[in-house]
Amino acid sequence: SWLLAMVGFRYNIDQLFLPVVAISGIGIAFINPDRKIYHWLKFFFSLSFLFVSLSYIKSGMEGWVSHTDLGFFSRYPSIVFVLLGASLTGVVQSSSATMALTLSALHSGGISLYMAMGIILGSEIGTTLKLFIASANGLASKKRVALANFLINLVTTLVVWIILTPVYRLVNQWFGDQQELFALVFFQTLVNLVSLSLFLPF
């Protein structure tokens, strides 16, 4: 998330990474998987594809926001955005994808930082769905792990949601209106630190 905020929205990087995607993709297709360079090619392919995808998401979001009035969303309470984040992450099965979409919407001016924080907070719950799916036909131990992960994320989300308004004011004061992308990524890091502080002693 920090890498996306620092690089993905500051520079037009799709033209740089498109050739990397092509070259590394060809290498993956023809090089023996047992060779060390194969794994490096997979790494560069995945990283480059991430930034190319982000570029298309960003341009698509900017076009959508320019033709859509999202002002009415500001009237909704924070719980709506928490539920939206949980639902979106449950559908796409990736909190990273939710973060990329939310950063794009925030960068385009479609949503406020407060709305974005609610969406990212909700993604903590939505990301647990894939563990439930993976453990559906598995051992009882896998189901317990999935349930424990859900409860940890649920408690963390509830705790942070209760104090979301003062946390928003504090984060917004630290970063200001010009650094909202970094403020959102910092908030996600803060949520993870809260989770650690709540459950690490146990």
Task: Give the label of every model feature segment.
Residues 68-83, 110-115, 177-183:
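Membrane-interfacial loop-to-helix junctions in multi-pass transporters
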